[in-house]
Each structure stands twice: as structure tokens, then as C-alpha cells.
Amino acid sequence: MSYSVLEALRNNPDYVKKVLTARRLDTSLVDKFLELDKKWRQLKKEVDELRHVYNQLSKEGAKAPPERRREIVEKARELAAKLENLEKEVEKIEREREDLLWSFPNLIHDSVPICPEGVDSIPVRYGGVVKVAKDAVGTLKDVEYVIVDKLPIGHADMAEVVLGMVDTLKAGEVAGSRFYYLLDDLVWLDFALAMYAMDRLAQKGFRPIIPPYMLKFDVIKRVLDFDTFRDAIYKIEGEDLYLIATAEHGIAAYLYKRELVEDELPLLFVGWSPCFRKEAGAGSRDLKGIFRVHIFHKVEQFVFSLPEDSWRWHEEITKNTEELIKDLGLPYRVVNICAHDLGAPAAKKYDIEVWYPAQSMYRELASCSNVTDWQSYRLGIRVTRKGMRREFVHTLNCTGLATTRTITAILENFQREDGVVEIPKVLRPYLEPIKAAPKDYIYPKKRS
């Protein structure tokens, strides 16, 4: 089976146009591609036919008497020149066709919502109890809540002013905006969150992995929509290397150009890495604190799956992250991302959002995507099925925990009025062995 987008373009172009319309993209790409594809197939047929004639002439020339051989050789020489020119034309058209094919986003699953302007996601389910002020209750729907007289302090002020364990001012002076110094007990909390997520997921059969933090251009362009994200990722000056924006990129590339057999799948990985992001489109959003920053640590689930199993795995990895967040004691919701906001690689994406009581709103903490064969086609990762049928594998990714963002959620949901932050119980076993680490509570740092 060939690449699903290519199959759909050839066999059901109207469906692809519907997908592009749902994604709010230009549908004229379909007709442009079909024209190129038709031309490429016609030329390729001509090349194959001409090569067959050339091969026949070569065989005939080898057996022909000397007086006929010269004539045959001359014909073969003319055919070879024509064949060479035609092959160059085929290569040129093929490159144009391939470039255009790469510009197509993934197809979308039937359950992906097509939404009106101003709506980016549809809530699927809720977990936990949110703290909310009385005057904000009307904004909540299908949510279990408790009314509080006083809302907690926002995570940015809590981390920097009350606890004194984040310093964005000094980081801004020496590195620029959206950088930070993480200090004291929040450092241990960052480590504990990563170990908690890695341990839980490893127990579920995910293989721990730390990927390279940089990838070559020829590789990174295959794992993400490079034209869209060119300005969002960092390039190493003077090197053919880009910093990864998530462990997903490096893990996907781990099987670059791999040929698998059916019994090897699924392959489950849980990766940890720093993530480097320019946040070029963020503007003035979340300038305070460590919610939206240029570098952070993240645990990532990644699955290489048989095509028929990928939708089951999509639900599975989403539930894995739900469990991590639920067991931390953070109120959350799962939302189904609208077609226009999916991003090119995903056929469907869930976001898991956590309630921030100081802001009285849910904020994204994790994303879980089924990328189907969009990445594997570009990376050349195939599986040979029984009967020797070859297919592209499906790839899926899902945040385990992004540690700094999870810290911000803990600071708002677990703080007391005296400025003390309770450490979620599930994290305490990961802090117990470390003598210098906090165990039950994080106390404001005493000012001298």
C-alpha cells in the first residue's frame, strides 16, 4: 500500500479537497498535483516502453550478422540519447511532483470536528474538581467545581516573588526574554516530575530513550512541517544542524530508512529531552513566569504501530497522560482539536488542558497526535506484512509531562494561603532518596 495521501489524491481527489477546506487551506493544490502526477506517469510509461525497445535492440544486435549489426547499433544509439533526455525530464517532473506532495497535510479522521471561526477545540471529557470564584461559575459547563472565597496567587508571582525559586529578570539580562533560572526546590520538583512520568510509562512497556538534541536538515524536514516551523526552531549557525523542539523529532528519526517486519511492531518509546523553541508567534502572551519559554524539559511517548492498530494506540497514549495528570491531583479536561488547528502532520489530535485557578481557565499541558503515515512516508519507515506486502508504519506521539509547565500548574493548584506549596503525593517517592530535596512541602525561601 502506498502513502495514504497519494492514494487519496489519485482515487478520491474530492475528499482531499474537503480535507483542505476543513483545514482552511488552498484546494487548488489538488488539481496542480493531479496534473503533475498524470504527466509524470505518462512520461514514465514512455521511458519504460522505450527502455524495453532498447533492450530488445541490444539483444537483437548481439545475435545479428555483421552487416545488420551496424544498423542496429545506430538505432540503439539514437534510442539511448532519446531515453537519456526523457529520463531527465521524468526526474525533473518527479522532483516537482514530490515537492508538491510533501506540501500536503495529513488526511483527517472522521471524528475530527470542523469548527466555526473562534472555536479551536471541542471538550471530550473532564477530570477532577476545579477551584473557582463565585462570579466565574457561569463560565463552566459539565465541570465539577468548588467555590473559593480567595483565588490563589498566579504561578509566575508564586514562583518568583513568593517562593523566590525562579529568576526571569537575571535570565532576561544574560539571555533574553522567555529564559529563566530555576532554583532550589523547584529544581528537584522538575527532576521528580520527569522521573515520575518516565517510571510510570516504562512500567507500561515503553522503552526509555534520550534522543540527540540536534538533527540534520535532511532529517528534521521529514519529521515536521518544516515550511511552517522554519521560524519556530533554532538552527546552529555554520552547521547543518537544528535543535529539536521535542523528543518526538529525535525518536521518529531513530527508525529513519528502517525496514521492519510485522512481528516487531508496535515499538513503544518514552523519551526525555530538553525542548528548544523560538516561540516566534507567541508575541506578548505569557511573558511572565515559566509557562511559555524557549527551553524546557519534556517526557514524550512515541509509538511505531501497524496501520490497523494506530487509532487504538491514540486512545491508549492519551489515557496514559490523563492518568499521570489525574494522579498528580490536577483538574483537567481532554479536548478534540478542530481540523483547522491540527497542524499538517496530525490526522487527529487531543490536547489535555489543566485548570489554572488564578486565571480561571484551562491551559494546554499535553498534546497527543496520530500522525498515521505522514512521517513514516517521509522517513522511509516501512513494515513488510505477511505475504510480503509492504506498508508505511503509523507513528503517534503524546506528551508524557512537560515539567516546567506542570510545575506552574502545581503552584496554582497546590498552594496554601501562607505561601507553602504541597508536593503531590505521587512525586514524593522520587524525592525521598535525595537528602537535599523537599519531601512533602515547598516553603518560601527566606529572604536575608
Swiss-Prot record:
Its EC number is 6.1.1.11. ATP binds at residues 277-279, 293, 364-367. The keyword Nucleotide-binding applies. GO terms for cellular component: cytoplasm. L-serine binds at residues 246-248, 300, 399. Keywords: Aminoacyl-tRNA synthetase, ATP-binding, Cytoplasm, Ligase, Nucleotide-binding, Protein biosynthesis. InterPro entries: aa-tRNA-synt_IIb, aa-tRNA-synth_II, aa-tRNA-synth_II/BPL/LPL, Ser-tRNA-ligase_type_1, Ser-tRNA-synth_1_N, SerRS_1_N_sf, SerRS_core, tRNA-bd_arm. GO terms for molecular function: ATP binding; serine-tRNA ligase activity. It holds the Pfam family tRNA-synt_2b. The keyword Protein biosynthesis applies. GO terms for biological process: selenocysteine biosynthetic process; seryl-tRNA aminoacylation. Pathway: Aminoacyl-tRNA biosynthesis; selenocysteinyl-tRNA(Sec) biosynthesis; L-seryl-tRNA(Sec) from L-serine and tRNA(Sec): step 1/1. It is found in: Cytoplasm. It is an enzyme of class 6 (ligase). It catalyses: tRNA(Ser) + L-serine + ATP = L-seryl-tRNA(Ser) + AMP + diphosphate + H(+); tRNA(Sec) + L-serine + ATP = L-seryl-tRNA(Sec) + AMP + diphosphate + H(+). Consists of two distinct domains, a catalytic core and a N-terminal extension that is involved in tRNA binding. PANTHER family: SERYL-TRNA SYNTHETASE. Belongs to the class-II aminoacyl-tRNA synthetase family. Type-1 seryl-tRNA synthetase subfamily. Catalyzes the attachment of serine to tRNA(Ser). Is also able to aminoacylate tRNA(Sec) with serine, to form the misacylated tRNA L-seryl-tRNA(Sec), which will be further converted into selenocysteinyl-tRNA(Sec). Homodimer. The tRNA molecule binds across the dimer. This is Serine--tRNA ligase. The gene is serS.
